[in-house]
């Protein structure tokens, strides 16, 4: 089955270790972006994964494409356009000092892209599953219009659409609230992925959940999922990640899935000494897409997604460099971290 993900991939510039920005005169350069991260996860699991974006014609973009190809992601559908490559700067947190992200995405190639710039007949050729996030619609008004066009074109072709709502308050700067856009985009989504804040800010659907407290009441998430599915009858299910933030490097991690009939809750992992949590949600999304297409029951699909994401917290960089067997071992209870010989 061919899976296409669509969004922006950026140059990631990170302060070394747990240093503050420019504490030393260097930044570690890699690449990353929500939808690209999902494509890499799926390729690592042996799925036929393609990534679609708009990139400039320069050497940095070429290096980015080569990096994706290294992981087995098909990049043939990437469109070249005007503009620049987006950048994000990352400062890794520790203990009570949170991680910090600074975006530099204005006038990037995908921010300048508009409806009509992508040949959707070509893009969706052979595709059975399409994945997008709420990040691309936040970048610019034209990128928002292109995102809406993408899901509309996908549904015309009866392609399954998954969307990670991914609310990013610092990106919505062109005059529209996230909910104005995402409530429309959600009408074309089959599988929704979110955390509690995403649902509240992107869909304006709430229950009495304190998103800042770090404490979880799972019954309220059942109600929250029900409200989303009642509001969007097109959705087949919604998965909600459950993160308890004790500190920047100690999180509790679990998820639930609601398909309107049954409510599934995963095992909870206590993740201590987090190495890099950026991309953790994307690794969950990639794991869920894999799980829903490779397991007969939704509980196993959910457990795979949560275990995959748990492992990502110990992997440096945006991409989740783990295999199906790595995830399966953790699902099976092998989480000791002992040397495997």
Question: What are the functions of these language-model segments?
Answer:
Residues 171-261:
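Conserved phosphate/ATP/ADP-binding segment of small-molecule kinases
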Residues 4-19, 251-267:
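Acidic-glycine-rich active-site phosphate/pyrophosphate-binding loop
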Residues 158-165, 171:
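Short beta-strand/loop segments at the ligand-binding rim of alpha/beta enzyme cores
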Residues 264-334:
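Conserved post-catalytic alpha-helical subdomain immediately downstream of the catalytic base
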Residues 153-160, 232-236:
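A short helix->loop->beta-strand "cap" motif at the edges of active sites that frequently abuts
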Residues 49, 75, 161-162, 193:
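Hydrophobic beta-strand scaffold residues
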Residues 48-135, 327-341:
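Conserved N-terminal subdomain of the carbohydrate kinase-like
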Residues 1-73, 94-96, 113-115, 273-275, ...:
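Glycine-rich phosphate/adenosyl-contacting loop at the front of the ribokinase-like
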């Amino acid at each position: 089955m061919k899976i296409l993900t669509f969004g922006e991939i950026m140059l990631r510039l990170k302060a070394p270790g747990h240093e503050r920005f420019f504490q030393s005169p260097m930044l570690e350069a890699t690449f990353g972006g929500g939808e690209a991260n999902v494509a890499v996860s799926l390729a690592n699991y042996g799925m036929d994964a393609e990534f679609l974006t708009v990139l400039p014609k320069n050497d940095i973009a070429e290096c980015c494409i080569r990096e994706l190809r290294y992981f087995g992601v098909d990049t043939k559908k990437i469109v070249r356009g005007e503009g620049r490559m987006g950048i994000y700067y990352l400062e890794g947190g520790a203990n009570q000092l949170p991680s910090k992200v600074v975006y530099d995405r204005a006038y990037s190639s995908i921010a300048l892209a508009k409806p009509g710039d992508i040949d959707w007949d070509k893009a969706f050729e052979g595709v059975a599953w399409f994945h997008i996030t709420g990040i691309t619609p936040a970048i610019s008004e034209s990128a928002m219009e292109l995102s809406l066009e993408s899901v509309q074109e996908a549904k015309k072709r009866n392609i399954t659409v998954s969307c990670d709502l991914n609310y990013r308050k610092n990106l919505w700067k062109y005059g529209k609230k996230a909910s104005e856009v995402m409530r429309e985009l959600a009408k074309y989504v089959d599988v929704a992925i979110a955390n509690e804040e995403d649902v509240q800010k992107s869909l304006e659907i709430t229950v009495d959940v304190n998103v800042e407290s770090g404490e979880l009441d799972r019954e309220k998430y059942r109600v929250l999922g029900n409200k989303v599915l009642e509001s969007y009858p097109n959705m087949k299910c919604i998965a909600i990640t459950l993160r308890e933030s004790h500190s920047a490097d100690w999180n509790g991690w679990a998820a639930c899935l609601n398909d309107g009939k049954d409510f599934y809750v995963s095992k909870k992992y206590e993740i201590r000494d987090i190495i890099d949590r950026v991309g953790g949600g994307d690794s969950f999304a990639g794991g869920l897409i894999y799980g829903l297409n490779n397991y007969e029951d939704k509980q196993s699909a959910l457990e795979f997604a949560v275990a995959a994401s748990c492992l990502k917290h110990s992997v440096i960089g945006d991409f989740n460099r783990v295999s199906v067997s790595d995830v399966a071992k953790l699902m099976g209870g092998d989480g000791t971290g002992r040397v495997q010989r």
